[in-house]
């Protein structure tokens, strides 16, 4: 009522009436703008106006018990009036000050734990170094980048389950924590945050930052790893850049970097094996990066890189639909084409069979150091707009586009024969033959391409055959632009198929990736990569192959020993002996193998000459296809440390040294493990392999309990029967002999009996 009276008084003054009647507020759009919807239209003004009131804040009723009515200065902190339309009370900003100074405190120990990502960011900035500011045109291109450093790689659903389990363990709702990383993180965080008083919602938000990769599509001119992205606003503007070195690395960037290196190594190695796809899968499944299984990382990490995508395709994961050629990612933005096989003649009159794309198409090409827009028709480049960091990068992009265009003048520019091969010594396909040829030398290509006069277009200049800029002339159809071409922003993934030679195709049969596209760049990984597969032993050179081969034999000696006596051929064919062959001089491989196999056969035939150490030492040499010759050797040569080193057939050498006292083997001075059994027990090895002192009674008999291992047999009493596990997981029933005299005949009969019992 009082307000209405006040208004009446105001209206009685002529000035008020004049203002309200003469000032036009009849613009409907403006009235609508400020009066419709819940969205605040002028937040700054609203804030100022609200804060000018005495009690601009509302709080829960419980606050009255927790805060005095007045502070030390006698100022009122809260009002007895309720907030209109809710059961909250009105509070003065001074109450916040009082609460901050005198309110309850919690232990500070949890802050660095909950706000971990912020504390770490401060550390990185503190130790980072900012260099000089340079003013120059920035060629920024939008790329999908990771914006929160230091996160684990869970997807949103996995993270949600972890957060619920950590922050709200008693809430109802099914939560399935399956992956190794989920379980580890949950356990870690529960321990860390016991008795934490920070608001659960805050903890949940902060956990989300720590667990989930967040990506944005941002214009970037420099480094794209998350520790650079977090300071993007400090390091690059429209016309300036500031040099910056991060003051620390974060695991998520290291994971990506190490994963790319591992994937490249694995693809390169798989290419040269007999069955590339099977080998690649075996290696991916047996490799760990920073202690986490590589396949788990591949499943969770959205990074796109040629080798990484080949590994993903092999695992049946979806990958991006763009394709790769010459190290550039191509994305078709319009047009269509059909593919036809065509035969073309090079400048050297060599015939090439190429798959020609017939039809008009437009592509974006994105590389690490250059980007381009390409418009082409059937075997004709219509236009190429390229931008890059330097002359060299621009030239790379131009070569790739010219080859991709399949123009006749490009094919005619070939001088000499095309016979490039891949790592497995197979000829490359014609398109990659052409690419390699011009990447080596593009002079003739650029000279023969032709030049044209150009119009003056803003932001574009011409480029001459010698790669110098020009404003008058340019290579036909080619222009250099100041603006970069954005990376393809979509995160869409498609189903692909992969053949045994690691060529990845989309569902229409277009090749998206092949091993030729995998970069040869070598880097040093930030996180430890552990390749358990024998195929990767050679990655660290010949010494590693030697040590790993002998370590493998010793670790698996129980099984190896049984195979040695019963099924040597199968043993010789084991892939673990493959890398070793590259150390044996080519000319000697067959002879060594024949010699060692004969020696082994004599050991099997004549009992008592068995020598564990000698078998271990010579075994890898027997894996090569043998040559029948009467050659005898007292030492065998292996190529390590840049020269041939000798392994003595009888006795120790620097390469292979067995210490009887410690029962340990050192290979080239590196420890290769210990032998569990005593090699000096005369004929121990082989006869324990064929069960010395036991009579083989026949097939497994369940009444005698579970199968024992060879080692457990020694506990049997004389005459006692047991099932025993031998060789390839076969089980036979044996009885411990009552007398020792008949031991010698066991070896001969055992082999026959085992075969009979199994078959």
Swiss-Prot record:
Its GO CC terms are: host cell nucleus; virion component
Sequence motif: Nuclear localization signal, positions: 736-739
Q: Where is this site: Avian adaptation?
A: 627
Q: Name one GO biological process term.
A: DNA-templated transcription
Where is this protein localized, as stated in its record? Virion; Host nucleus
Q: Which UniProt keywords apply?
A: Cap snatching, Eukaryotic host gene expression shutoff by virus, Eukaryotic host transcription shutoff by virus, Host gene expression shutoff by virus, Host nucleus, Host-virus interaction, Inhibition of host RNA polymerase II by virus, mRNA capping, mRNA processing, Viral transcription, Virion
InterPro entries xrefs: Flu_PB2_2nd (IPR049110), Flu_PB2_6th (IPR049114), Flu_PB2_C (IPR049115), Flu_PB2_CAP-bd (IPR048298), Flu_PB2_middle (IPR049111), Flu_PB2_N (IPR049106), INV_PB2 (IPR001591), PB2_helical (IPR049113)
Which Pfam families does the UniProt entry name for this protein? Answer: Flu_PB2_1st, Flu_PB2_2nd, Flu_PB2_3rd, Flu_PB2_4th, Flu_PB2_5th, Flu_PB2_6th, Flu_PB2_7th
Report whether Nucleus shows up as a keyword of the record. Answer: no
Q: Which GO terms describe its molecular function?
A: RNA binding; RNA-directed RNA polymerase activity
The entry's family comment says: Belongs to the influenza viruses PB2 family.
Q: How does it assemble?
A: Influenza RNA polymerase is composed of three subunits: PB1, PB2 and PA. Interacts (via N-terminus) with PB1 (via C-terminus). Interacts with nucleoprotein NP (via N-terminus).
What this chain does, per the entry, is described as: Plays an essential role in transcription initiation and cap-stealing mechanism, in which cellular capped pre-mRNAs are used to generate primers for viral transcription. Recognizes and binds the 7-methylguanosine-containing cap of the target pre-RNA which is subsequently cleaved after 10-13 nucleotides by the viral protein PA. Plays a role in the initiation of the viral genome replication and modulates the activity of the ribonucleoprotein (RNP) complex.
Q: Which HAMAP family match?
A: INV_PB2
- How is this protein named in the record? Polymerase basic protein 2
What species is this protein from? Influenza A virus (strain A/Duck/Hong Kong/2986.1/2000 H5N1 genotype C)
Gene encoding this chain?
PB2
């Amino acid at each position: 009522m009082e307000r209405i009276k006040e208004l009446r008084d105001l209206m009685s003054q002529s000035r008020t009436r004049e203002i309200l009647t003469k000032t036009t507020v009849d613009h409907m759009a403006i009235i609508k703008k400020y009066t419709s919807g819940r969205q605040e239209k002028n937040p700054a003004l609203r804030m100022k106006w609200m804060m000018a009131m005495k009690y601009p804040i509302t709080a829960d009723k419980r606050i009255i018990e927790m805060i005095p009515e007045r502070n030390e200065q006698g100022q009122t902190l809260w009002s007895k009036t309720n907030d209109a339309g809710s059961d909250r009370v009105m509070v003065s900003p001074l109450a916040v000050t009082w609460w901050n100074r005198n309110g309850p405190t919690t232990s500070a120990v949890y802050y660095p734990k909950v706000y971990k990502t912020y504390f770490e960011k401060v550390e990185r900035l503190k130790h980072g170094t900012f260099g000089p500011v340079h003013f120059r045109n920035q060629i920024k291109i939008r790329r999908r980048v990771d914006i929160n450093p230091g996160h684990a790689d869970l997807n949103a659903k996995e993270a949600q389950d972890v957060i619920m389990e950590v922050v709200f363990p008693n809430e109802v709702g099914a939560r399935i924590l399956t992956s190794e990383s989920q379980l580890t993180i949950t356990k870690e965080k529960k321990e860390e945050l016991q008795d934490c008083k920070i608001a659960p919602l805050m903890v949940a938000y902060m956990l989300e930052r720590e667990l989930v990769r967040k990506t944005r599509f941002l214009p970037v001119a420099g480094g794209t790893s998350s520790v650079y992205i977090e300071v993007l606003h400090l390091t690059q503007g429209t016309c300036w850049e500031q040099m910056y070195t991060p003051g620390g690395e974060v695991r998520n960037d290291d994971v990506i970097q190490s994963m790319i290196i591992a994937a490249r190594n694995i693809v390169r190695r798989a290419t040269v094996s007999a069955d590339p796809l099977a080998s690649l899968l075996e290696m991916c499944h047996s490799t760990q990066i920073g202690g986490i299984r590589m396949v788990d990382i591949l499943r969770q990490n959205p990074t796109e890189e040629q080798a990484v995508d080949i590994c993903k395709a092999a695992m049946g994961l979806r990958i991006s639909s763009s394709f790769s050629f010459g190290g550039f990612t191509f994305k078709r933005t319009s047009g269509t084409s059909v593919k036809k096989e065509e035969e073309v003649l090079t400048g050297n009159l060599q015939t090439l069979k190429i798959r020609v794309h017939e039809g008009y198409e437009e592509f974006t090409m994105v590389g690490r150091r250059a980007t381009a827009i390409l418009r082409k028709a059937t075997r004709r480049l219509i236009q190429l707009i390229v931008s890059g960091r330097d002359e060299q990068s621009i030239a790379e992009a131009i070569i790739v586009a010219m080859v991709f265009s399949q123009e006749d003048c490009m094919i005619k520019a070939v001088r000499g024969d095309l016979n490039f091969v891949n790592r497995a010594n197979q000829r490359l396909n014609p398109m990659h033959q052409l690419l390699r040829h011009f990447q080596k030398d593009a002079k003739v290509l650029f000279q023969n391409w032709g030049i044209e006069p150009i119009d003056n277009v803003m932001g574009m200049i011409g480029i001459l055959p010698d790669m110098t800029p020009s404003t008058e002339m340019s290579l036909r159809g080619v222009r250099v632009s100041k603006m970069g071409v954005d990376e393809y922003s979509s995160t869409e993934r498609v189903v692909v198929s992969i053949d045994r030679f690691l060529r990845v195709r989309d569902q229409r049969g277009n090749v998206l990736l092949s091993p030729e596209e995998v970069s040869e760049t070598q880097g040093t990984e930030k996180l430890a990569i552990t390749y358990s597969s024998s195929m990767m032993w050679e990655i660290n050179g010949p010494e590693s192959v030697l040590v790993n081969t002998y370590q493998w034999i010793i670790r698996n000696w129980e099984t190896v020993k049984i195979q040695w006596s019963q099924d040597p051929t199968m043993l010789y064919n084991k892939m673990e002996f493959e890398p070793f062959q590259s150390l044996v001089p080519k000319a000697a491989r067959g002879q060594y193998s024949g010699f060692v196999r004969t020696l082994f056969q004599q050991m099997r035939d004549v009992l008592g000459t068995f020598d564990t150490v000698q078998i271990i030492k010579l075994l890898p040499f027997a894996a090569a296809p043998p040559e029948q010759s009467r050659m005898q050797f007292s030492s065998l040569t292996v190529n390590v440390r840049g020269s041939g080193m000798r392994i003595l057939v009888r006795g120790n050498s620097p390469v292979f040294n067995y210490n009887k006292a410690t029962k340990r083997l050192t290979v080239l001075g590196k420890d290769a493990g210990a032998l569990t059994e005593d090699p000096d027990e005369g004929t121990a090895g082989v006869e324990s392999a064929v069960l010395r002192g036991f009579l083989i009674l026949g097939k497994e008999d369940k009444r005698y309990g579970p199968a024992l291992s060879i080692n457990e047999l020694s506990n049997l009493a004389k005459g006692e029967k047991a099932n025993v596990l031998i060789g390839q997981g076969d089980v036979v029933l044996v009885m411990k002999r009552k007398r020792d005299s008949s031991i010698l005949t066991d070896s001969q009969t055992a082999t026959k009996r085992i075969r009979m019992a199994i078959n």
